[in-house]
Amino acid sequence: MKKEIVTNENGIIKILNEFGITKPILEEASKMDINVPMLFYDKIINNPSAENIDNVTKNLLGVYGNYYATHYFKMQGYDVENEVGVYDNGNLLTRADISFIDSNGVRNYCEVKAAYQIIDNIRNYKDNSLEKTGYYKNLDAEIIKYKKIGEKLIKQVKKLSKDGSLVNVIIFDGCYMDEIIKQELKNLDANIITLNVNIYDLEENIKKNVLRILSYFSKNVTINIDYKGKKNR
């Protein structure tokens, strides 16, 4: 069977589209400064290691998380913006994943966390090692990559709420958030919203799709693209 020759980014996009990574997902990724075609080119097509497959999966998990959260608020009738700058005395402090004005005229900022767990760092891990204890000993080892997510979340919520805006933390079905983090968010007047999308199923499906795309490129495609000078996460 003659292999398909891909000579530009549009050729990669066409194949990604065929595997369900369509324009809305690519646009969401672009807002997050993630070039998905280049990501696949760098990590999957050129160097398909287990680490790179995991890297692409995690990047796409964040993209899909923002996509589903954006869709959720649009369905509520809100005029949603993504990656909105939050300023302090004219200086860029951070960016909100999602921003909208609610029915009371209040500015809302949203921080989306597509994670298995959001846990106080001290309780979560022992001696900063890869070994989990307590509640988490039976969870997948990949969860260790989220060990600092709770600490980062609290810092981000503090930044987002600095101007008095309402802050929503968006998590997904299956995500475990411990009571320490919940209390800290409550103290910051942040709301926790859980979307009815299971985080485990979402990541598993994304990874399966990444592997299918890898298999397709390996068997059916010859790549001849020069991405020289371009960078990706």
Where are these regions (language model features)?
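Short linear proline/tyrosine/threonine-rich motifs used for host-factor recruitment
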Residues: 13-15, 107, 231
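Active-site beta-strand-loop-beta-strand hairpin of nuclease catalytic cores
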Residues: 90-112, 117-119
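Catalytic cores of nucleic-acid endonucleases
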Residues: 112-194
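Domain-level recognition of nuclease-like catalytic cores that cleave nucleotide substrates
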Residues: 162, 166-233
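Acidic, metal-coordinating catalytic cores used for nucleic-acid/nucleotide bond scission
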Residues: 87-90, 94, 173-179
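Charged, low-complexity intrinsically disordered tails and linkers
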Residues: 1-44
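Acidic-basic catalytic patches of nuclease active cores, encompassing PD-(D/E)XK
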Residues: 7, 32-89
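Acidic surface patches and DE-rich sequence motifs
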Residues: 8, 16-17, 87-89, 102, ...
